[in-house]
């Protein structure tokens, strides 16, 4: 059994790399992206890149995690170079924003990796600088998706200050897992303070669903047969974000509150 009493044996994770997270694009050129520069010291005192750090943390929390990296053609060799030949890579033929990128990766999981439609999948950006507890929360997110009480499960980051950099998730209540009341665009500081008074969480672009949920969504919005067909016609796909195409229209949505340390390297204002 894949999951025994909602405890998942392993996670299916899609890591969005290669500029699907467009906030990173202005900071670095396409090929030598920020996420491959060895900036971070690990416990052994060795320098590692963002991609290496995230991959190491996931496999530490869940040694059997199945990680697929959705990326551009120009970054595929850098990823193999840093993570080894066995890493699973779904290559986007061209940039089409996050909904097509995630739809392509979901169909890749289904058709190429033989992931079943009732298995949970977690999507996260490759650029958070976090403690290992974050990936324990990601595992919990997979378990919530597996339990199937909502179509979509998001991770919301407990804000440390009224930031203008993030969209906000307003939950129905302050519980660890809550239904989502509404989403808010990036606010000014005064508005952000009002959100914080409503238990609001930062929307960090981390979400989970059963694979079949996204395959169905993709078929309802895109005319295609299977992964190969979508890949071949990818350049004809409409550019649309996952938030806009799926998240904001989903009536059945819940959020898991995460209160650990979290820094999003994609919004760092420092430059190296």
Where are these regions (language model features)?
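Short beta-strand segments
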Residues: 15-17, 70, 122-125, 154-158, ...
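Residue-level signal for inorganic ion chemistry
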Residues: 51, 105, 127, 169, ...
């Amino acid at each position: 059994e894949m999951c025994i009493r909602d405890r998942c044996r392993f996670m299916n994770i899609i890591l969005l790399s290669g500029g699907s997270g467009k906030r990173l694009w202005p900071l670095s050129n396409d090929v030598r992206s920020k996420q491959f520069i060895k900036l971070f010291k690990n416990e052994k005192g060795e320098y590692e890149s963002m991609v290496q750090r995230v991959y190491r943390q996931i496999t530490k929390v869940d040694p059997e995690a199945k990680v697929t990296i959705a990326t551009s053609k120009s970054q595929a060799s850098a990823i193999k170079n840093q993570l080894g030949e066995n890493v699973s890579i779904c290559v986007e033929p061209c940039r089409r924003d996050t909904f097509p990128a995630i739809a392509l990766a979901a169909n890749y999981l289904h058709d190429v990796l033989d992931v079943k439609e009732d298995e949970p999948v977690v999507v996260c950006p490759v650029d958070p600088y976090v403690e290992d507890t974050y990936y324990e929360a990601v595992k919990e997110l997979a378990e919530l998706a597996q339990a199937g009480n909502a179509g979509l499960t998001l991770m919301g980051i407990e804000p440390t200050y009224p930031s203008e950099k993030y969209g906000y998730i307003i939950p129905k209540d302050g519980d660890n897992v809550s239904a989502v009341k509404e989403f808010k665009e990036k606010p000014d500081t005064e508005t952000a303070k009002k959100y914080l008074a409503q238990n609001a969480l930062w929307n960090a672009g981390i979400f989970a669903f059963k694979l079949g949920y996204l395959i169905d969504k993709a078929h309802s919005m895109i005319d295609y047969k299977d992964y190969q067909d979508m890949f071949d016609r990818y350049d004809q796909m409409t550019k649309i974000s996952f938030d806009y195409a799926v998240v904001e229209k989903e009536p059945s949505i819940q959020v898991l509150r995460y209160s650990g340390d979290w820094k999003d390297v994609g919004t760092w204002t420092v430059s190296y």
